[in-house]
């Protein structure tokens, strides 16, 4: 990357890759994915350990829901149940909790949660679920009724940016600024997002403008905070004497002696950054990346 290095190659601060881009290796293809991953081997005499932050983004969202509640001195409905579940069981499954509260199956609960997190519209959600737009709309309404804190947090972060007193940025766990400095007319029509001076010149000084893409604010905050968790974890394991072989999204890969060695690395990763809910890492071990299985 000629403008910025790969260790900060994305807007959110997440690592980018090229030559090759390992983040784009096929993972869902049951034949091709493992075949390519079997080419990645540990050091001689050791095993490959893939250690990833379990449901990193949902945990961060739950953390911010708690932080938002404390800041407003008003608990977002439903968030305390998630906090307690995580504290009682660090391995708790966010999507199963959502599905149970909303009265839907886990697959739909997960799809809706991720759709809201990434700013997906009703039409795309309907395609993902294989249902009509009207059914998707009703399913989303039921979700918000039973699990209201997700929508309330999304709107809260968005409102923070749209406040006239806002500097146009929010900060991640480690203080990285997520900037929203493009503008467009405050209408329902589609407009190109522009820097403020250009937007005023294009649409006139009397046109009411709004910040663009604020509906993506929670997603940007969570992505930046995920990077703010993963990078300190990499530093901690390096200082402990283990250099990661790969870093793919929320996963670090190592050459390890045995399961106990992998568990020690997972412990370092889990404690690199403190949240209001406990972190948990899943461990897969095997003779290669493609043959690593959960332990």
Spans of features found by a protein language model:
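Conserved catalytic core of nucleotide polymerization and phosphodiester-bond processing enzymes
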Residues: 1-295
């Amino acid at each position: 990357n000629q403008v910025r290095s790969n260790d900060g190659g994305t807007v959110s601060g997440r690592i980018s890759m090229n030559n090759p881009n390992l983040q784009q290796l096929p993972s869902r293809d049951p034949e091709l994915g493992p075949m390519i991953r079997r080419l990645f081997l540990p050091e001689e005499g050791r095993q490959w350990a893939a250690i990833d932050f379990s449901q990193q983004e949902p945990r961060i969202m739950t953390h911010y829901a708690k932080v938002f509640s404390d800041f407003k001195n008003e608990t977002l409905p439903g968030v305390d149940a998630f906090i307690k579940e995580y504290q009682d069981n660090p391995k708790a499954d966010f999507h199963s909790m959502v599905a149970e509260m909303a009265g839907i199956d886990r697959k739909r609960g997960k799809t809706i949660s991720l759709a809201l997190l990434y700013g997906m519209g009703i039409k795309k959600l309907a395609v993902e679920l294989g249902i009509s737009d009207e059914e998707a709309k009703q399913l989303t309404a039921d979700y918000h009724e039973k699990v209201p804190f997700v929508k309330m947090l999304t709107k809260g972060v968005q409102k923070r940016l749209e406040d006239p007193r806002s500097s146009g940025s929010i900060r991640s766990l480690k203080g990285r600024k997520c900037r929203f400095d493009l503008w467009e007319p405050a209408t329902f029509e589609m407009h190109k997002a522009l820097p403020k001076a250009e937007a005023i010149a294009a649409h006139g000084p009397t046109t009411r403008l709004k910040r663009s893409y604020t509906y993506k604010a929670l997603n940007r905050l969570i992505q930046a905070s995920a990077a703010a968790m993963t990078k300190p974890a990499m530093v901690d394991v390096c200082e402990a004497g283990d250099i990661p072989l790969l870093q793919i999204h929320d996963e670090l890969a190592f050459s390890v002696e045995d399961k106990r060695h992998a568990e020690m690395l997972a412990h370092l990763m889990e404690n690199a950054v403190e949240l209001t809910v406990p972190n948990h890492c899943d461990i897969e071990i095997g003779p290669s990346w493609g043959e690593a299985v959960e332990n």
